[in-house]
């Protein structure tokens, strides 16, 4: 708990109000990135959480095919996770690591509510190489 304006610079009453207000608004999201997460996704989603994110690289590695997302096994895993989430009426998220705008609509069509778009190092890498691409 820092000494910031949001917490009243450490003033006890404001700090308590801040904690209670924020605690009521906290949402919980699971990351499904392994065979264990895949196997237990129904149970995980029934635990009063708000949603989940698939980490595709870790999940594909757990399926013994790191970085490959177009296999039947990966697609079946993804469909199982999406279906379990929809049954529990929780938000579905996907971490789209490669910064490809065209993939956003495809993920939305699959039923994802939230898409974490790329990571800074991939965007910097691609942006830095762009002037040299012919």
PLM features per residue range, with description:
Residues 57-58, 118-123:
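Short, acidic/turn-prone active-site loops that include or flank metal/cofactor-
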Residues 1-48, 56-58:
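Conserved anion-binding
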Residues 54-72:
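Glycine-rich, proline-tolerant flexible connector loops at the mouths of alpha/beta enzymes
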Residues 1, 16-24, 70-93:
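Alpha-helix-loop-beta-strand connector modules within alpha/beta enzyme cores
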Residues 43, 76-83, 102, 106, ...:
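Alpha-helical scaffolding segments of alpha/beta enzyme cores, especially the outer helices
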Residues 66, 108, 121-134:
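C-terminal helical cap(s) of enzyme catalytic domains, especially alpha/beta-barrels
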Residues 36-47, 97-113:
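Catalytic cores of alpha/beta
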Residues 28-32, 52-54, 92-95, 113-117:
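Hydrophobic faces of well-ordered beta-strands that scaffold small-molecule active sites
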């Amino acid at each position: 708990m820092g000494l910031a304006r949001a917490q009243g610079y450490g003033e006890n009453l404001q700090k308590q109000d801040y904690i209670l207000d924020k605690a009521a608004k906290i949402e919980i999201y699971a990351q499904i990135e392994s065979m264990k997460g895949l196997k237990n996704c129904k149970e995980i989603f029934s635990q009063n959480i708000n949603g989940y994110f698939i980490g595709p690289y870790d999940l594909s590695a757990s399926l013994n095919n790191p970085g490959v997302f177009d296999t039947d096994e990966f697609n079946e895993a993804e469909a199982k996770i999406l279906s379990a989430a929809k049954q529990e009426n929780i938000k579905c998220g996907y971490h789209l690591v490669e910064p490809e705008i065209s993939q956003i609509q495809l993920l939305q069509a699959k039923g994802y509510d939230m898409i974490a778009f790329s990571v800074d190092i991939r965007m910097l890498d691609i942006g830095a190489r762009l002037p040299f691409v012919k």
